[in-house]
Structure formats: structure tokens, C-alpha cells
Amino acid sequence: MRMIKFLLLAILLAPFVAHSSGQEVKLDKAPIDRADKESLQRGAKGFVEYCLTCHGANFMRFNRHHDIGMSEDDIRADLIHTGQKTGDLMEAAMRKKEAEGWFGVVPPDLSVIARARGADWLYTYLRTFYQDTSTYSGWNNLIFDKVAMPHVLHHLQGWQVLEPGTGNLVQTKPGTMTKEEYDRFVADLVNYMVYLGEPHAPYRRELGITVLLFLFGMLGLTYLLKKEYWRDIH
């Protein structure tokens, strides 16, 4: 129930906390594959390294990563760097007062951000930051105008500027990754955030199929039983 309320609140507030830059931007299709556990593990590591400092994921516990093939030792080595236990919630390292002082607003919890925004929106958002000297952070975003969040991945992607007149992004300084490598990194990160929003989704689908098959089977048995009961009457 708590997750449902949070998701509804995020959806309702989205139009008030973000708006586009005045031009229509086509969202890129995110290559999501929830069955790819290696991608989910890479995404989990990237999330902890680059997102969990400011953003929390308070509906998720570290030990839930057993679902994506991570052992207890893997979780401790790759995901826990602050002395937390594997059964603890994934809380942001930065305190709320500090975050508000830095960004003017407390960074949102990312537990259900993929369900609120959509995978394609996140995939496009994380790849369309550009330098903008008119903003407080020095960064802006093609689909989230005047975003408070700085581009924390700029050293990976490189520096981009918005080309006047065309609305295209042009790279002015390369990062440590090629475009293909960065796109793959973001795809893994978004894939993980989709998993984060509903870790039990694969089990729910399997259970749903099993229940439907059971009901269809029961329907057939019920029909045969009905025919047997009414055989003498008909």
C-alpha cells in the first residue's frame, strides 16, 4: 500500500516538478531485458556508485539482490560501502538537509521512478544533459528544462552543448566512454531501475499464467461434471 501511494504521488506531482524545454523531444527506446541478470548486476553497481549518494531506494533491501544472482559476498563487496547490513534498506548516503542545501530540493527516492516516468524517459534523460551557464548547476537537460540535478555522469559521457537553432546536442569534450559504451551503461542502469520498481514482476507473471491455466482446467472439469449431473435429465 505504501508503494502504491508513493507511485500515485510521483505521477501526480510530475507535471509540477518538471517541464520540457519548449520543444518536442522523441524518447529513445530503452533496451530493457529483465531476464538479463548480468545487465541487472551491472546496473545495480552503477546505481550504488552514482545514484545512491543523493537518492534513496527505500522500498528495496540489499539482500533482495539475491533475485538477480548476487551472492551475499557479492552484495557486501559491490553494493555496500557504508557499513550497512545486507538486510538494511537502500537509503541515500547524503542527509536531507545537506541535499536541500546543495540542490535547493531533496532528491527524490528512486524506488518507483521507472514506473512513474517510464524506462524510455529515463534512458533519454540520462543521455541528454548539456552544459548551460544560465542554470545554478551549470547543466540542463533536453527533456527536463532547468533540472536541479547536475550531470553526475559527465566524466563518462563527456561534455555536450545545445546547438543554437537546431536543438541538437554536440559533444565538446569526450568522456572516458565511447558513445556505445555509455549507451550500454545507461541501458544497464535503467534496466536495474525497472527491476527496482517491481522486483517480483517475473514471479507475478509466472503465477498469473499458472492461475489462468488452473482456471481453464477447472472450467473443463466443471463442464464435464455438469454434463454428468444432468445426463439423466437431458
From Swiss-Prot:
Keyword Iron among UniProt keywords: yes
Signal peptide extent: 1-20
Keyword terms, alphabetized: Cell membrane, Cytoplasm, Heme, Iron, Membrane, Metal-binding, Monooxygenase, Oxidoreductase, Signal, Transmembrane, Transmembrane helix
Family: Belongs to the cytochrome c family.
Segments crossing the lipid bilayer: 206-226
Lineage: Bacteria, Pseudomonadati, Pseudomonadota, Betaproteobacteria, Nitrosomonadales
Protein name, as recorded: Ammonia monooxygenase gamma subunit
Protein's membrane topology: Single-pass membrane protein
Pfam families in alphabetical order: Cytochrom_C1 (PF02167)
Molecular function per GO: electron transfer activity; heme binding; metal ion binding; monooxygenase activity
Entry's Gene Ontology cellular component terms: cytoplasm; plasma membrane
Domain Cytochrome c intervals: 38-193
Cofactor binding notes: Binds 1 heme c group covalently per subunit.
Subunit composition and interactions: The soluble ammonia monooxygenase is a nonamer composed of three alpha subunits (AmoA), three beta subunits (AmoB) and three gamma subunits (Cytochrome c1 PetC).
Subcellular locations according to the entry: Cell membrane; Cytoplasm
Residue sites binding heme c per the record: 51, 54-55
Cofactor: heme c
Record keyword Nucleus present: no
Biological role: Part of the ammonia monooxygenase complex, which catalyzes the oxidation of ammonia to hydroxylamine, the first reaction in the process of ammonia oxidation to nitrite.
